[in-house]
Amino acid sequence: MIIITDTAQKYLTTLLAKQKSGTQIRVLVLNPGTPIAECSLSYCPIDTVTKKDIKLEFDQFCVYVDQLSTSYLEDALIDCVLDELGTQLIIQAPHLIEKIDSNTPLLERVNQIILSCINPQLANHGGKVTLITITEDMFAIIQFSGGCNGCSMVSYTLKEHIEKKLLQLFPELKGVKDLTQHNHSQYSFY
């Protein structure tokens, strides 16, 4: 599943020698399968290992991965490079981001980006956006809810973040329109 070069194994062994006895390595996948997916390494104290973790054994240490992340780490490579900044670990995980098939209908592709890229950012303010439809004249029709409904920044968010992102990824779209009947309430972010 994960290949760790000899150089990287030696470096990780050196780092682990400075940690509490029994500490291993954990590979984490954040937002797996989405365009904002990230992969990282962390120390893994032995008391944080669960039955749902997959254990990968190497010569001097073990790597733990949660079961849900395994398919995203297939063919992953961890290497070590030395440059002017010092030693750096590099993680290459070719299956970290699911490819959106170009044959998938535009509505589904746009919705996937809204769910995986846009809504996680809006959730920081208690809001979200729902894709209602894409019109025949190629406008994405959306509706805000939660903290976004009634927020004084909603026009800015729509034009400068949502529309820019969607037009960048889907040039066939002509724009994004808001269908929301905005009512400022105690739950509105601003």
From Swiss-Prot:
Pfam families: Fe-S_biosyn (PF01521), NifU (PF01106). It comes from the Bacteria. InterPro entries: Fe/S_biogenesis_protein_NfuA, FeS_biogenesis, FSCA_dom_sf, HesB-like_dom_sf, NIF_FeS_clus_asmbl_NifU_C. Its cofactor is [4Fe-4S] cluster. Binds 1 [4Fe-4S] cluster per subunit. The cluster is presumably bound at the interface of two monomers. Belongs to the NfuA family. Involved in iron-sulfur cluster biogenesis. Binds a 4Fe-4S cluster, can transfer this cluster to apoproteins, and thereby intervenes in the maturation of Fe/S proteins. Could also act as a scaffold/chaperone for damaged Fe/S proteins. This is Fe/S biogenesis protein NfuA. It comes from Baumannia cicadellinicola subsp. Homalodisca coagulata.
